[in-house]
Amino acid sequence: MRKFFSMRFPSPVSVQWLADFLGAGLVGDKNGQATGINEIHKVEQGDLVFVDHPKYYDTCLRSAASYIIINKAVEVPPGKAILIVDQPFEAYLRIVHHFRPFEPAAKMISDSAVIGRGSYLYPNVFIGHHVTIGSNCLIHPNVTILDHCVIGDNVIIQAGTVIGPDAFYYNTKKDRAVWYKKMASCGRVVIEDDVEIGAGCTIDRGVTGDTIIGKGSRLDNMIHIGHDTVIGENCLFAAQVGIAGAVRIGNGVILWGQVGVSKTLTIGDNAVVLAQSGVPSSLEGGKIYFGYPAEDASVKKRELVWIKRIPELWKKVMAGRPEEGRPKAH
């Protein structure tokens, strides 16, 4: 079972310090130590989260998160603390920018990057700050690997691919001039061992956690993987597959060309989705799917056969009706 990492602070941070830093009211366990900041769907003990809508108060308070930035005084569960501010989203941004500040790049390969033995980088490869690349990797021209991303051993990345751009993820409020405010992305991309990624792909970093490509997987050209998506081992994706954010894909999954996968769903182990299918909801493993919405391929193909026969069947139906009962042409 994979462990999903949040953005960790360099060392545990006093919740009292956080309250002072944010100018927040502090209620609950005032002696706690926050270890990192995370999203609500994958928090763990010691994590800090924010919530700014009553709809999600209860979810946050009942989650594993130890510390909640919130915009209303509420009853605090035992062992937790809340930090009360007017704008929790802005407080989240302040914390992220403090612990993960912007670092200008002065070189094509950062001095803080670690590159393993036997790895070869073609000309015009950009390697950001605090990137780790394993042994015996081959990174083709014009690849960009942005800050804090992790590349395993024996990985091949073809030309023009970008690893670690910001998540397409926004705080949305329509009562302000700018409806969509950018969520600062402080997560990573982790490419495990023995992965090959084709040309012109983009793999977004997690908002606070990791986007993961599992060991032995193969990605064709021009594929997009959204933030916080976790892809299992030995998966095979053909060209122009698009996967939205926070998707969980099992081991041995095959997605053929131009398959589109919607956000926050799960595809089970060894599922196969045929070309140009759309996946709007979770799929069980071990089956072959086709169409939009993607369904069992054998059922979908039979449906298509019957759809093609509609004109023929319509003629037969009309041929058996009396003249006065037939619909009139307009």
Predicted regions mapped to residue ranges:
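Terminal amphipathic alpha-helical/low-complexity segments used for targeting or macromolecular assembly
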Residues: 1-107, 111-112, 154, 160-161, ...
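Structural signal for interior beta-strand "rungs" in well-ordered beta-sheet cores
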Residues: 50, 107-296
